């Protein structure tokens, strides 16, 4: 099973991702965090395979949390999740050490696909971001 941590500052988003991803028997949601500080601590104690990381959280952003997690390990796969499609956000997260980027316009099916690909060691960009990068 792939151990997943969900990190988002919006309760409804956390609950929706949890509900959706819990239906896939390959995934196990091991923690749900509401800010960057919580996800950093959860990564230290729970050793997830994948973190789904909202980039806009307070007081510690998803970008900063990604950077801190990367200072401790390269073993955890991190997929950024955001409403932002601007390349500076994508670049900042990827430079911090993320393995992928998915916008909140993406489907649950696409998120599961992203998880599977980053677990294979590949980078993943949702179609919306891939189209922007290629244009």
Give a label for each model feature.
Residues 8, 54, 82:
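Active-site residues of response regulator receiver
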Residues 41, 63-74:
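Short amphipathic alpha-helix used as the core "switch/output" element in two-component signaling
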